[in-house]
Structures are given as structure tokens and as C-alpha cells.
């Protein structure tokens, strides 16, 4: 059917490049967009605007439309830098309203299997920020994956000689969870990271 509509075939192919979108979902999305031309136009306009306006902050490397970003230019506590893998991770921390310092987005994690080395990340820029500023603490908030843990250990080795406090986000049992349903590795981390009451 799609061999007679190369433009539609291309749209489906582009949609399939998005994470979690397979052939059937891409087809469904393409046909939905074609049914409502105003949605198609709005989506095209939004994609064009994102491409034209969104960039990485020159200080923390988070995605932003303002450079430096509102967090870097907004008078936040610059003595503490929270290091995250992605802008999405930064947004999750912001939604928690538990942190009020500055950020540094690595734009990935060390992954030798995928060919991502420390030089491919924004680690050099982090070290330069620390050397230039009055940073007292770096909070490492990489994901609790093999890549995130590898990145955290690498960062800790790079940062400790600088004489600043280096901390890692705690990990443990999620709020509202029954212990019987939590995986053994998480229970181990929670037990090791227990605190006084």
C-alpha cells in the first residue's frame, strides 16, 4: 500500500526513529496526522521552532531557549553543582523541588559498549567550572545503571583530588513500595545506605 505513497513511507520511517515507536505505531500516527491537517501543520511548526530556538546552555549544557538558561542566570546557589546525564534528568530533579543549586548536564553517560568515552561527555567543561568558581560540593546524580555507575565512579576519581565535597544521590526503596516486591539489588543498596532516625 505505501509503495504508492513515498512521502507517507518517509514519514513512517522518520516516526520509527523515535524511541518506543515501531512500524504499527508509526503508521497509526501518520494516518492520524493525515486525518487532521491542522494538527500536521501545528506539529511541523513546533518541530521547526524547536530546531531554530532550542540550544544547549553555555554554562550547564541543559536544553534551553535562553542562553545562559534561567537556572544559570537566576541567582541559584552556584556553590553546589548537581551533575546529571540529560536535561530530562534535570527536569525530574526540578519537579521534586528538593534541590536549589546549579546543574551540569553531561549529555550522556560513559558506555564503552556504545563507544561513549569520557571525552565524549561534558566532563572537561565541568572541571573548568569547578576551577573557575567557588564550588564546594558536586552532587553526582547519574542514573543507577551500569553506565551511570561507571560515570559516577569516573567523576568521583576526577573530582576528589580537587578538594571539594563529592556526594552521590541516595538510592533505595521507592516511597509507597512493598519490600517484598523490590528487587534484591535495591534492597542491598537501601540496607547499605540506611540512616539514623
Curated annotation (Swiss-Prot):
InterPro entries: DNA_Rcmb_RecR (IPR000093), Rcmb_RecR (IPR023627), Rcmb_RecR_Znf (IPR015967), TOPRIM_dom (IPR006171), TOPRIM_RecR (IPR034137). This is Recombination protein RecR. It comes from the Bacteria. May play a role in DNA repair. It seems to be involved in an RecBC-independent recombinational process of DNA repair. It may act with RecF and RecO. Belongs to the RecR family. One of its GO terms (molecular function) is zinc ion binding. The keyword DNA damage applies. The keyword Ribosomal protein does not apply. Residues 79-174 form the Toprim domain. Keywords: DNA damage, DNA recombination, DNA repair, Metal-binding, Zinc, Zinc-finger. GO terms for biological process: DNA recombination; DNA repair. A zinc finger (C4-type) spans 57-72. SUPFAM superfamilies: Recombination protein RecR.
Amino acid at each position: 500500500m505505501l509503495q504508492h505513497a513515498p512521502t507517507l513511507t518517509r514519514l513512517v520511517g522518520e516516526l520509527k526513529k523515535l524511541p518506543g515507536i515501531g512500524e504499527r505505531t508509526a503508521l497509526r500516527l501518520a494516518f492520524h496526522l493525515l486525518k487532521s491537517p491542522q494538527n500536521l501543520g501545528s506539529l511541523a511548526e513546533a518541530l521547526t521552532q524547536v530546531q531554530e530556538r532550542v540550544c544547549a546552555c553555555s554554562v550547564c549544557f541543559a536544553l534551553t531557549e535562553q542562553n545562559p538558561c534561567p537556572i544559570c542566570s537566576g541567582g541559584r546557589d552556584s556553590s553546589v553543582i548537581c551533575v546529571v546525564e540529560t536535561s530530562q534528568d534535570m527536569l525530574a530533579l526540578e519537579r521534586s523541588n528538593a534541590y536549589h543549586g546549579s546543574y551540569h548536564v553531561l549529555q550522556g553517560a560513559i558506555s564503552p559498549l556504545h563507544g561513549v568515552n569520557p571525552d565524549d561527555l561534558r566532563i572537561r567543561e565541568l572541571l573548568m567550572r569547578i576551577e573557575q568558581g567557588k564550588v564546594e560540593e558536586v552532587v553526582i546524580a547519574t542514573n543507577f545503571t551500569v553506565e551511570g555507575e561507571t560515570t559516577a565512579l569516573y567523576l568521583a576519581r576526577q573530582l576528589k583530588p580537587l578538594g571539594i565535597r563529592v556526594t552521590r544521590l541516595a538510592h533505595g526503596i521507592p516511597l509507597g513500595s512493598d519490600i517484598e516486591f523490590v528487587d534484591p539489588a535495591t534492597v542491598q543498596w537501601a540496607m547499605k545506605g540506611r540512616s539514623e532516625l
